[in-house]
Swiss-Prot record:
GO terms for cellular component: ribonucleoprotein complex; ribosome. Keywords: Ribonucleoprotein, Ribosomal protein, RNA-binding, rRNA-binding. Located on the platform of the 30S subunit, it bridges several disparate RNA helices of the 16S rRNA. Forms part of the Shine-Dalgarno cleft in the 70S ribosome. NCBIfam families: PRK05309.1, uS11_bact. GO terms for biological process: translation. InterPro entries: Ribosomal_uS11, Ribosomal_uS11_bac-type, Ribosomal_uS11_CS, Ribosomal_uS11_sf. This is Small ribosomal subunit protein uS11. The keyword Ribonucleoprotein applies. The keyword rRNA-binding applies. Belongs to the universal ribosomal protein uS11 family. The lineage of its organism: Bacteria, Pseudomonadati, Pseudomonadota, Alphaproteobacteria, Hyphomicrobiales.
Amino acid sequence: MAKEPTRVRRRERKNIVSGVAHVAASFNNTMITITDAQGNTISWSSAGAMGFKGSRKSTPYAAQVAAEDAARKASEHGMRTLEVEVSGPGSGRESALRALQAAGFTVTSIRDVTSIPHNGCRPRKRRRV
């Protein structure tokens, strides 16, 4: 007897007009998470999730593709305006922001929330190349 095929349930549309885009740009990858005002995740994407591997993940183009993907998923839920919080030293910061604006979102504010230690933990040893 053949098993019935499992039905794929489509996510319900959330109808959230404004939200916050968190762009975490490290030296190795760029992650974009779009949340509502309370911090509940609406959509997310990263350079690695878009199929880039190794050193290609850290490129501005990979960040742009990831931001376009996260923006497309968020706009399916009816999102129109965004506040952008950028953190980290990576090369994908500006290109991710530009891609979010090009996707048709109105960016109301841009904040840099990169954490800077006030002499906290001891840093790892310097790389000698």
